[in-house]
């Protein structure tokens, strides 16, 4: 096959998230495959012939047998820490269990978080060109693609996933690098914070596979409180969660205390802005003539924006902004007023 014919083939799209990796072909409405971005290794000695075979497990098989495995994520806060495991996961994407295609025959669109180290991008390119021999590679910011998915070319994308939270203002298809805001507080930090609260309530989840149970509890039981100070004084309704072994646990105030970390990173000693401040600061760093348009086109993306309680156009804003922001921000952004002139879209799979 000639090189031109190869480049003209349908590109492979790999959304390389810190917690979940999604893969498919360009032009499809949804990803073809989606699985956790981790590698599992057996932590027990194999003593029977019929035991699970293999030293490394990825994808659905790792999910199915995670109780026997030591789970390790190759990415932390959007940056690859273990390139050997990351390469194994990408190899699995092309395997017969996933896309069932040859990497040499398809260009690749790879996503990454903004403001990542340049070395991270260079190493990814090196792996795809030298190991997988792809004919072409394009690395794009996740936020830009989220805006494209809504059919818009102007807006500000607040993307909060498993490893990174960032706000990216885009105007008529142009991202504004000087206005991009990023904090390394996201879903995995909320899961760890929830695990700490559950331990205080008498439920101990210490192994790497049990951490995935905490993550599932977070996704199903946690919510954002509009007024956390008030909820602390009230008798919080407890939610029951069924564990894989059939037992149940009751979760109380931890349901709203853990996600509060997104708005108050100081709860774990981090000196960074909350997710609501990141959004406003990113818009404020943009040109004054563009701010009203950006405030009118806010796109939420990423798994950590799926908590119950995220503000919709008819609901009050979950957090009051600092006094320094309120003077330059539409008054509807404060807690007491609804999001009347602001259009919020939620995108994701």
Swiss-Prot record:
GO molecular function, one term: ATP binding
Cellular compartments per GO CC: cell cortex; centrosome; dynactin complex
Gene3D superfamilies reported in the protein's UniProt record: 3.30.420.40, Actin, Chain A, domain 4
Keywords associated with the record: Acetylation, ATP-binding, Cytoplasm, Cytoskeleton, Nucleotide-binding
SMART domains membership: ACTIN (SM00268)
SUPFAM superfamilies given in the database record: Actin-like ATPase domain
Keyword Electron transport: no
Family: Belongs to the actin family. ARP1 subfamily.
The name this protein goes by in its record: Alpha-centractin
